[in-house]
């Protein structure tokens, strides 16, 4: 069942003061103004200047005007969001944003002790994320889509609008005569997410009017299953050791080996192996029956190799 913006904010219970990630677009404008109405004097706006568009300075000026009118302190961080070779532009921008949020929280911590940050992704964004994951053949982590709450670098992140349709946010703003800016990149059909939004979501709306709620329910089921797999991986790691030791690892079934290795790589190194890389690694582990068997396989941005009785991951670019 979809939720209205007022109801979503009523149920939202963060620690105060609260920072809202504010781009100037409709979604973050609605979240910022609704939170500022509920907690006057307790809300701050974090704006990240990516420098990727000529209009970035205009975005910042717009945010300054809105925050001044709403009496919300605005904190701006300029970042270099250009992507490195082999890195997607979206991933580079995302990483830069989170680093900026962490820096802004540190900059303001002496004054306001901000520990909670709210992001404005809504129900349509959640559907788009799930469809993108399906198109890539993602496993449970991808099918879980976006979490409503998580902790990163000591900060509590929240997505209180995941049950609210995007159209509801714009209608709420129009009722108040509140303005926002349109990011030109949102209309760029070169991006798959934009094509999903413009072409696929209207078809889903016509065929399955409740698709936002049902897709969200599927993502929640996937998130629960993912949590169980993480618990199993932790139990197996406690027996196999960190870094993983080959002999006890080989005693596990192939699916449990894969689950353990995915969790170890992601939790320890933020490395995500491809399906092909993981399959090759599992084949090598199965074939490793002698002390002299050598393993060295490209995995994510680094390599896994056998050292003695265990497996080790390293990134040559980061090694001294």
Predicted regions: what is each one?
Residues 1-198:
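Core alpha/beta nucleotide-donor-binding catalytic domains of modification enzymes
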Residues 2-26, 39-44, 48-50, 79-83, ...:
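AMP-forming adenylation/ATP pyrophosphatase catalytic core
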Residues 108-124, 214-233:
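Electropositive, surface-exposed helix/loop patches at the edges of structured domains
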Residues 170-220, 224-227, 306-309, 315:
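Mid-to-C-terminal catalytic subdomains of enzymes
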């Amino acid at each position: 069942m979809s939720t209205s913006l007022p109801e979503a904010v009523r149920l939202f219970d963060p620690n105060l003061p609260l920072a809202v990630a504010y781009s100037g677009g409709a979604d973050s404008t609605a979240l910022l103004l609704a939170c500022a109405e509920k907690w006057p004097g307790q809300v701050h706006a974090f704006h990240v200047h990516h420098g990727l568009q000529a209009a970035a300075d205009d975005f910042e000026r717009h945010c300054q005007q809105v925050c001044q009118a709403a009496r919300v302190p605005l904190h701006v961080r300029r970042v270099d969001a250009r992507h490195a070779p082999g890195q997607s532009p979206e991933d580079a921008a995302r990483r830069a944003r989170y680093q900026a949020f962490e820096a802004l929280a540190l900059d303001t911590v002496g004054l306001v002790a901000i520990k909670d940050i709210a992001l404005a992704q809504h129900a349509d964004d959640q559907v788009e994320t799930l469809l993108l994951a399906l198109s890539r053949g993602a496993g449970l982590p991808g099918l879980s889509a976006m979490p409503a709450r998580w902790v990163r670098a000591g900060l509590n992140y929240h997505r209180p609008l995941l049950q609210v349709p995007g159209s509801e946010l714009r209608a709420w703003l129009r009722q108040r005569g509140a303005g926002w800016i349109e990011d030109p990149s949102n209309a760029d059909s070169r991006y798959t997410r934009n094509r999903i939004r413009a072409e696929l979501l209207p078809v889903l709306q016509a065929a399955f009017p409740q698709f936002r709620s049902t897709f969200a329910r599927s993502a929640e089921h996937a998130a629960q299953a993912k949590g169980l797999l993480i618990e199993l991986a932790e139990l197996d790691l406690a027996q196999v050791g960190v870094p993983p030791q080959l002999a006890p690892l080989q005693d596990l079934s192939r699916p449990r080996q894969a689950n353990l290795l995915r969790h170890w790589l992601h939790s320890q190194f933020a490395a995500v192996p491809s399906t092909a890389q993981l399959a090759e690694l599992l084949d090598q582990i199965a074939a490793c029956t002698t002390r002299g068997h050598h393993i060295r396989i490209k995995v994510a941005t680094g390599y896994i190799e056998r050292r003695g009785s265990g497996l080790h991951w390293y990134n040559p670019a980061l090694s001294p």
